[in-house]
Swiss-Prot record:
It comes from the Bacteria. It holds the Pfam family DUF3713. Residues 82-105, 238-257 are annotated as: Disordered. This is Uncharacterized protein MPN_485. Belongs to the MG307/MG309/MG338 family.
């Protein structure tokens, strides 16, 4: 019988309506949302994370106690190797075909750095003499090292491949079932886009995201209306719900205004230009258009991540 992991990856790809092939086209991601600069592997973030994941400081000494030590090497395995490693190291059922029906697909499996390896894991490690060029991606729960496409995933063409995104989520799904799910106080989460998730918090704390939410709030309701802003995994970065006076009275007294409202009011107080009627302010309208354009690719990615997360939840 097909295991849960095979169902998970098959469901993900089915919903995305994309065949799992190495030639699968990706969609462009704004470089602003990727810490590593396009075609620049000497970026300070890249080199720093490379040293940290390798257990070295700038001076080359051992850095095993560093807070980034939880980063693990990830290798790309064939479906048969992944099945063996997953059943032994991640608690999967022995009949799981992680790679799905095509058989030639691969999945990411973590290999422990110092823990004693089982015989199966030793065999898997022996088949992978050298890791591909690692890719350091900033996710909702921090920065983690992934070995995909020799660095092409983020660095070479600045695209994010749907199939590889599915692989990453499955990797984290398997990781969630292993003893290494929590290490050195660091926890991983599949809750990417729901209210209160770390991904949502990261998105809301970005200045551009806050500005976007503030502009939408002001455009939709004006200065005096209370709004509730939230970043959703859909076609918008900020979903603004305008509350009437009657609805506001019905809410508990401890309801607080969102950060976007506070920022909106601050902008209104600090800028006479922004305080003008918004529909008559060409500068404001142009700024809003520019920001919406900047978020276009990011919103498409967020929508796909939301679908992936839903599928994983259904089979968990």
């Amino acid at each position: 019988m097909e295991g849960k992991d095979a169902v998970a990856i098959r469901s993900i790809v089915s919903r995305a309506k994309i065949a799992m092939t190495d030639q699968t086209p990706g969609f462009k991601v704004d470089p602003a949302f990727v810490k590593v600069k396009q075609n620049n592997q000497t970026d300070a973030f890249y080199t720093t994370q490379r040293k940290l994941s390798g257990g070295q400081t700038n001076g080359g000494s051992n850095n095993s106690n560093d807070k980034h030590h939880y980063l693990q090497d990830a290798v790309r395995l064939t479906s048969s190797q992944a099945m063996a490693a997953a059943s032994t190291g991640a608690g999967s059922s022995s009949g799981t075909n992680v790679g799905g029906s095509s058989g030639g697909n691969s999945v990411l499996i973590p290999l422990p750095r110092s823990a004693a390896l089982t015989h199966t894991q030793q065999q898997v490690q022996q088949t992978t003499s050298t890791l591909q060029t690692p890719v350091y991606a900033r996710g909702d729960d921090g920065t983690y090292a992934l070995a995909i496409d020799g660095g092409d995933y983020f660095l070479a063409n600045n695209k994010r491949d749907f199939t590889k995104q599915a692989d990453i989520l499955l990797y984290r799904y398997l990781q969630a079932k292993s003893n290494n799910f929590k290490e050195n106080g660091v926890e991983f989460s599949l809750n990417l886009l729901e209210s209160g998730s770390l991904f949502q918090t990261w998105a809301q704390t970005g200045l551009t995201a806050k500005l976007y939410g503030a502009l939408v709030a002001m455009m939709g309701s004006g200065q005096g209306t209370q709004v509730k802003g939230s970043v959703q995994g859909s076609s918008r970065a900020a979903s603004v719900s305008v509350q009437t006076t009657q609805q506001s009275r019905q809410q508990s007294t401890d309801t607080q205004e969102s950060e976007v409202v506070k920022l909106a009011k601050a902008l209104l107080k600090s800028s006479a230009d922004l305080a003008k009627p918004f529909t008559d302010n060409p500068t404001f309208k142009k700024a809003l258009t520019d920001i919406q354009s900047e978020y276009k690719d990011y919103l498409a990615a967020a929508g796909k991540l939301s679908e992936f997360k839903k599928d994983l939840g259904e089979v968990s």
